[in-house]
Swiss-Prot record:
Biological source species: Influenza B virus (strain B/Oregon/5/1980)
Topological domains, Intravirion: 1-8
Topology relative to the membrane: Single-pass type II membrane protein
Pfam families: Neur
GO MF entry, a single one: metal ion binding
Active-site feature positions: 149 (proton donor/acceptor), 409 (nucleophile)
Disulphides: 87-420, 122-127, 182-229, 231-236, 277-291, 279-289, 318-337, 424-447
Residues in coiled coil: none
Record region (Hypervariable stalk region): 38-86
Post-translational modification: N-glycosylated.
Key words, A-Z: Calcium, Disulfide bond, Glycoprotein, Glycosidase, Host cell membrane, Host membrane, Hydrolase, Membrane, Metal-binding, Signal-anchor, Transmembrane, Transmembrane helix, Virion
EC assignment: 3.2.1.18
Name of protein: Neuraminidase
Residues involved in Ca(2+) binding: 293, 324
Length: 466
């Protein structure tokens, strides 16, 4: 009798051969979208050659001596991502702390990288924790200069969310002292900016390929948002700005598809200074961004970008809860919504994320607890309304970082569950050792989950004197 493996081949692979086609039918159900076409790609699988040199050759006359056959499968391509309704919940809770320098005694490949400007971006299957490193680790001998924003050594790196950004764990994507990244459902788009202040360059990487560039237009520190860009239907939108840190800096948006710039968008409205925007989808039609004005006001410039018309407008947030740092007392700025008020010089990137519900929308924001220093971080929310015209105070929703702990940049992102999106806010907690020692950051993460009240704040647990 033939061996069982040869019996199987006898049944399915005759001398004429059989083409096996597997048709996969899939339905991607988005709560905000329908009629999404599922495309297919052809995959060929070749079975290994099996020699049939048996003792009794008469037993195998019906079987070809070579059993190599090609089987063609029609497999679904990954689909473009679209915003969906948020997962259920009414409060944020402490989700995760990434505090690399708690492991600062490790050396070699296990040493934590010295980083700043962390942010998180998510694809359908994973989230990545990004940051800008100084190409140095702690402990190490290259601490000098790690407090500077821009130099020739800085790189955009990432690890899988939940991993510690060590030398060994980190992927180095490109040289960059400003960065962003996003996933379109099929592939990652990475953004890095570096070069001299007077002629910086945006570089785009799609998957593993470097695909496009964009040159400085004001010759004054071209830079991007330091948080995730936003993709819908294969189009990804990136905020950039170029101009003085204490004067005019007009932003633009780049529309990017598969790693290549296909359109520039020039916002209208209150455009004097807009930088470091944190952006997300209010709906399948509109991207909204809460940004930083480092020159004129402690109010946040608020962008509405229509992805159907590729137009954008900027106005100041009207709320009496001022979100920048430094800032005046809440409610102290008089006049119309576009009034700048005082204490507008200087600023900080702010956290912002949407909670999309069937009957309403929630907008969640973060700001430092201190009005003058980068200390502490508190969460606020406002349901429905228009940030351009609503002057009401935002509702405080809990302390994420106490006044005793550093609260620097913050950002928003969304984790993709099976049928909904989970809104989250991340907080950069900087270990500021001054110019003489290392200068790096931990990341605290809070996400929408369950009900009740936000229960506990985050500490880094790092003592720089150790």
């Amino acid at each position: 009798m033939l061996p069982s493996t040869i019996q199987t081949l006898t049944l399915f692979l005759t001398s004429g051969g059989v083409l096996l086609s597997l048709y996969v039918s899939a339905s991607l159900s988005y709560l905000l979208y329908s009629d999404i076409l599922l495309k297919f790609s052809t995959t060929k699988i070749t079975a290994p050659t099996m020699s049939l040199d048996c003792a009794n050759i008469s037993n195998v006359q019906a079987v070809n001596r070579s059993a190599t056959k090609e089987m063609t499968f029609l497999l679904p391509e990954p689909e473009w991502t679209y915003p969906r309704l948020s997962c259920q919940g009414s409060t944020f809770q402490k989700a995760l702390l990434i505090s690399p320098h708690r492991f600062g005694e490790a050396r070699g490949n296990s040493a934590p990288l010295i980083i700043r400007e962390p942010f998180i971006a998510c694809g359908p299957k994973e989230c990545k924790h990004f940051a800008l490193t100084h190409y140095a680790a702690q402990p190490g001998g290259y601490y000098n200069g790690t407090r500077k924003d821009r130099n020739k050594l800085r790189h955009l790196i990432s690890v899988k969310l939940g991993k510690i950004p060590t030398v060994e764990n980190s992927i180095f994507h490109m040289a960059a002292w400003s960065g962003s990244a996003c996933h379109d459902g099929r592939e990652w788009t990475y953004i890095g900016v570096d070069g001299p202040d007077s002629n910086a360059l945006i570089k785009i990487k799609y998957g593993e390929a470097y695909t496009d560039t964009y040159h400085s237009y004001a010759n004054n520190i071209l830079r991007t948002q330091e948080s995730a860009c936003n993709c819908i239907g294969g189009d990804c939108y990136l905020m950039i700005t170029d101009g003085s840190a204490s004067g005019i800096s007009k932003c633009r948006f780049l529309k990017i598809r598969e790693g290549r710039i296909i359109k520039e968008i020039f916002p209208t409205g209150r455009v004097e200074h807009t930088e470091e925007c944190t952006c997300g989808f209010a709906s399948n039609k509109t991207i909204e961004c809460a940004c930083r004005d480092n020159s004129y006001t402690a109010k946040r410039p608020f962008v509405k970008l229509n992805v159907e018309t590729d137009t954008a407008e900027i106005r100041l947030m009207c709320t009496e809860t001022y979100l920048d740092t430094p800032r005046p007392d809440d409610g102290s700025i008089t006049g119309p919504c576009e009034s700048n008020g005082d204490k507008g010089l200087g600023g900080i990137k702010g956290g912002f994320v949407h909670q999309r519900m069937a009957s309403k929308i929630g907008r969640w924001y973060s700001r430092t607890m201190s009005k003058t220093e980068r200390m502490g971080m508190e969460l606020y929310v406002k349901y429905d309304g228009d940030p351009w015209t609503d002057s009401d105070a935002l509702a405080p929703s809990g302390v994420m970082v106490s006044m005793k702990e550093p609260g620097w940049y913050s950002f928003g992102f969304e984790i993709k569950d099976k049928k909904c999106d989970v809104p989250c806010i991340g907080i950069e907690m900087v270990h500021d050792g001054g110019k003489e020692t290392w200068h790096s950051a931990a990341t605290a993460i809070y996400c929408l989950m369950g009900s009740g009240q936000l229960l506990w704040d985050t500490v880094t647990g790092v003592d720089m004197a150790l």
